[in-house]
């Protein structure tokens, strides 16, 4: 993705995290923001419908937006109601939607209803190819993966996990592999989540517990010296890939890095609308 657009508090916080990397142009849209070339202040309104109706033409604001676009939004917030009106004005771009799912038990009745509606509508839009894909992120899954997270800086830690993972997968996709059998996902596999794999144990943790996973791609970022010297790495990678290949098309790529530690990232694809 070349452009990241964050909507609402959660969306803007994640978009801001992407700004640490020079590859992305970041835009933020929320109530209370001052109007600048990259920030858009949305008029305070009531509920989803009110915020949707508050959005006028964004042609000037989006005039420099090009290439792939990652649109980031949390489904439970009032400002999220502006999403469809905004996305309509981005339909000529290659849209990827990053959807932040909150624990419904921690939401009020209105927010819970808003999340349920947007969660289903956005997935149906992705399945209809109005988006390239929807990437689902469950905050409760992120907390489980990270373990104990201090209250101060809680969401910053969760957001950093999401952003660093998506960024590294993007980097590896544009890096020559040492070995791979990766192919494009099936046309109908547009409901997606990312995750991490423990290279030592093979334990896999997706950022959203996808049902009916159709395809998985594993990105192995391995220290280059290890790739030159350790003769058992290929067998280890293949064993892990095969272990996770049950009823799923599974592919992988191996990439040399200068990092001391090794990292394994997973992208899972489904064609089925997820339920929560």
Placement of each model-derived feature along the sequence:
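Tubulin/FtsZ superfamily GTPase core signature
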Residues: 1-276
